[in-house]
Amino acid sequence: MKRVIAIGELLIDFVPGEKGCALREVSHFERVAGGAPANVVSAVSRLGGSGVMVSQVGEDAFGEHIIDVLQNNGVDTSWVYKTRRANTGLAFVSLDSTGNREFSFFRNPSADLFLSPEQITPELMADGAVLHFCSVDLVDQPVKQAHRRAIELARERGMIVCFDPNVRLPLWDSPADCRAAIREFLPCADLVKLSDDELEFVTGCRTEREAAEQLFAGGCKLLLVTRGAEGSAAYTPGAFAERAALRVPVADTTGCGDSFIGSFLYQLVRDRVTLETLPALAEAELGRYLDFSAGYASLTVQRKGAVMATLPELLAAYPALA
């Protein structure tokens, strides 16, 4: 199976030992390796695919822990660099009674921000099918140009470029700066994944259909929208599918969207969907992919932290997905 390559932040999430209280009230935390791009390729690898992470950590215990966790998940960490210029980033998380999150980030700057375009070479894209990235590392640091270089190389190889903005406003000087960076990179993406609460912020459109048409006009070939408890939807220029959410007990929503898009990308690569065939996916195919990813994400939210399930675990929970 060809590879899904993700570039972006690596950090430690400190997840709370209790739910239903504000971040300032949390009394103890548990260390969990995190970063949305890493969660995505962990999902791909845990499902039996081939995931590659491109990033940088500090020469510290937290960086070593992240690399260990990724390797244990089957992720190729050959392109995870180490630096003494900065420490590995940290994020402290609180959970309300429904499992939704509040973040406090410590990365001023963090090691991933110093990943340079010179560290991104053509060999990275060997046997690559998809390049995935988010917006957290699109700040005005060397890592932004590293993203540009990775996208350029992926384009040269005809890979699918996937962008999940994964908006994290506390990391930006202003919402306007965040929006501008996202919109700068939207034209690079063949597949865009948005949550329903990001849709208007990112696109300026009030409805999914309007957002889809706007993105298609800019070159996007597939839009995925996650709606939280209301399910998910997929749009191509010629097809549409939607699915209701699965009702499960929610422990923690951390990594839910990452597990959704990671399992979706796994299916695209498994089925050898290419840049040319992506916009031609039919309603039935889109629906099957949504069913699979909804099931996979439902397992993630039942666990604390972004812990990705294996394919046998998914099929044991939902045999109809086999």
List each model region and its residues:
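Glycine-rich phosphate/adenosyl-contacting loop at the front of the ribokinase-like
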Residues: 1-76
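Conserved phosphate-binding/catalytic region of the ribokinase-like
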Residues: 2-5, 152, 208-322
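Active-site metal-binding loops of divalent metal-dependent hydrolases
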Residues: 10, 165, 259
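Residues that scaffold the ATP/ADP-binding catalytic core of kinase and kinase-like folds
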Residues: 14, 104, 141, 202, ...
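Conserved N-terminal subdomain of the carbohydrate kinase-like
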Residues: 50-133, 316-322
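Short gly/ser/thr-rich secondary-structure transition/capping motifs
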Residues: 109-118, 171-177, 205, 278-280
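Acidic, amphipathic alpha-helical patches
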Residues: 121, 182, 250
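Conserved beta-alpha-beta core of the PfkB/ribokinase-like small-molecule kinase fold
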Residues: 130, 136-213, 220, 230-231
